[in-house]
Amino acid sequence: MSKRETTKYKIDRRMGENIWGRPKSPVNRRDYGPGQHGQRRKGKLSDYGVQLRAKQKLKGFYGDISEKQFRKTYEEAARRRGDTGENLIGLLESRLDAVIYRAKFVPTIFASRQFINHGHVNVNGRRTNIQSYRCKPGDVIEIREKSKQLVLVLESVQLVERDVPEYIEADHNQMKATFTRIPAFADVPYAVQMEPNLVVEFYSR
């Protein structure tokens, strides 16, 4: 198992949920957390615990990004007009690593981050190696010509376990996608329930 898979499944085990809806997730085979005491009944979480869990789950979904970066994203969402939770989801889904993952050019969010780091991605014709690059409506994201035959890409576009969301137009023949709009929370196809309102409550304490 690769390091990316180990990290991904570690997050699943920690949360006790199959966050990305992957068939091989270890939580598909058991209904308790990791460790020798995993089968013990868990006590009821406090309000703080529920809010913390919601934050950790959302943060984990986007590749377990750092707390500093996640909080910075939240603070930007809070400064914007409108609902902070909606703004937070829109900002997270606008990240380049999220768009590459949602377009099904790579199998996991972790692979997306590595793919970008290694310089395999163009945005509007220019190489971009910043995972957190904020895509804008109309941005064209493309796998660089020399990278289109990588096994990682070829295997990913054949996956049928998840669909490309409506706010991304993906052409898998050309390995190109257009980020058409910033999505609302209701538009985002999470495999498990996400609760951005609880994340807002966590940071508002």
From Swiss-Prot:
Part of the 30S ribosomal subunit. Contacts protein S5. The interaction surface between S4 and S5 is involved in control of translational fidelity. This is Small ribosomal subunit protein uS4. It comes from the Bacteria. Residues 94-157 form the S4 RNA-binding domain. Keywords: Ribonucleoprotein, Ribosomal protein, RNA-binding, rRNA-binding. NCBIfam families: PRK05327.1, rpsD_bact. It comes from Bartonella henselae (strain ATCC 49882 / DSM 28221 / CCUG 30454 / Houston 1) (Rochalimaea henselae). InterPro entries: Ribosomal_uS4 (IPR022801), Ribosomal_uS4_bac-type (IPR005709), Ribosomal_uS4_CS (IPR018079), Ribosomal_uS4_N (IPR001912), S4_RNA-bd (IPR002942), S4_RNA-bd_sf (IPR036986). GO terms for biological process: ribosomal small subunit biogenesis; translation. One of the primary rRNA binding proteins, it binds directly to 16S rRNA where it nucleates assembly of the body of the 30S subunit. With S5 and S12 plays an important role in translational accuracy. One of its GO terms (cellular component) is small ribosomal subunit. One of its GO terms (molecular function) is structural constituent of ribosome. Residues 1-16 have a biased composition (Basic and acidic residues).
